[in-house]
Amino acid sequence: MAELTALESLIEMGFPKGRAEKALALTGNQGIEAAMDWLMEHEDDPDVDEPLATPLGHVLGREPTPSEQGGPKGPGSAVGEGKPVLTEEERQEQTKRMLELVAQKQREREEREEREALERERQRRRQGQELTAARQRLQEDEMRRAAEERRREKAEELEARQRVREKIERDKAERAKKYGGNVGSQPSPPATEPGPVPSSPSREPPTKREYDQCRIQVRLPDGTSLTQTFRAREQLAAVRLYVELHRGEELGGAQDPVQLLSGFPRRAFSEADMERPLQELGLVPSAVLIVAKKCPG
């Protein structure tokens, strides 16, 4: 039974002649299987159907003859010898084998593409998990820092309250030592000795109240105002930062620094004042500040 040539087999399987010839030529006429591999790998190439430039006298897809290969001529290689013709049954059988080979190659290609897709999906999920873990670590770090800041502020408040209580106790002890006995107790005049009622001793001025917070109202150049509560120990720079973050666009944007003024008594706060606590600047328990553009220099 005579076999179909590789080119005829590819055409029989439905491949265009030009594409089949190109596949055989580019694979060095190594057989139908190599040509089929090339066709499947390059079927989506935009230039797959473009003709291939070949040397003069060479026919794409034609298997080289023994004379072209330089080998000896066999008894059946006479010029003009007719090629055996396949019967219809033989042709169908050979076509069936070729189609099975095509189907096998297609299955192998689909399996390879499926494996590659699965690997890409695993890679995508792995990257997503790593990104989620990184975000979670960042969030945990931020929460931990916030908790530490709250604990620090609470400790500072407790220390400040303790200092206030200790000062009150010292003041009480000093008054008791000065006037004798308990604070507020006054010696009663003798009942048996009539006479003018002794004048009560002069009272100590009331202890100045300690404030932990202060309410600041900031008036902006456009007539609007901002109101915020700050801790008495916070620096004036905290008020300026609050204004720069919450003011509108009328001052030229957040890149332009501002200057804080007090209305009465009239005072312009300097950079050195920004480092001083609000309590020390006399802004406790409440104050009104005016915002102006900071002059350059």
Curated annotation (Swiss-Prot):
Domain comment as written in the entry: The UBA domain specifically recognizes and binds 'Lys-6'-linked polyubiquitin chains.
UniProt GO MF annotations: ATPase binding; K48-linked polyubiquitin modification-dependent protein binding; K6-linked polyubiquitin modification-dependent protein binding; proteasome regulatory particle binding; ubiquitin binding; ubiquitin protein ligase binding
Region of interest (Disordered), residue spans: 40-210
Domain spans labelled UBA: 2-42
The keyword Phosphoprotein belongs to this UniProt entry's keyword annotation: yes
Subunit (UniProt): Component of a complex required to couple retrotranslocation, ubiquitination and deglycosylation composed of NGLY1, SAKS1, AMFR, VCP and RAD23B. Interacts with HOMER2. Interacts directly with VCP. Interacts with BRCA1 and BARD1; interaction takes place when BRCA1 is not autoubiquitinated bur is strongly enhanced in the presence of autoubiquitinated BRCA1.
Coiled-coil zones: 86-176
PANTHER family cross-referenced by the UniProt entry: UBX DOMAIN-CONTAINING PROTEIN 1 (PTHR46340:SF1)
CC terms in the record's Gene Ontology section: cytoplasm; cytosol; nucleoplasm; nucleus; VCP-NPL4-UFD1 AAA ATPase complex
Sites bearing N-acetylalanine, chain numbering: A2
Keyword Ribonucleoprotein part of the UniProt annotation: no
Function field: Ubiquitin-binding protein that interacts with the BRCA1-BARD1 heterodimer, and regulates its activity. Specifically binds 'Lys-6'-linked polyubiquitin chains. Interaction with autoubiquitinated BRCA1, leads to inhibit the E3 ubiquitin-protein ligase activity of the BRCA1-BARD1 heterodimer. Component of a complex required to couple deglycosylation and proteasome-mediated degradation of misfolded proteins in the endoplasmic reticulum that are retrotranslocated in the cytosol.
Keyword terms, alphabetized: Acetylation, Coiled coil, Cytoplasm, Phosphoprotein
Region Interaction with BRCA1, annotated ranges: 43-297
Localization annotation: Cytoplasm
Protein name per the record: UBX domain-containing protein 1
Biased composition (Basic and acidic residues): 86-122, 137-177
Modified residues (Phosphothreonine): T207, T229
GO BP annotation list: negative regulation of ERAD pathway; negative regulation of proteasomal ubiquitin-dependent protein catabolic process; negative regulation of protein K48-linked deubiquitination; negative regulation of protein ubiquitination
Ranges for domain UBX: 209-291
Pfam families: UBA_7 (PF22562), UBX (PF00789)
Biased composition (Pro residues): 187-199
Residue numbers bearing the Phosphoserine modification: S199, S200, S270
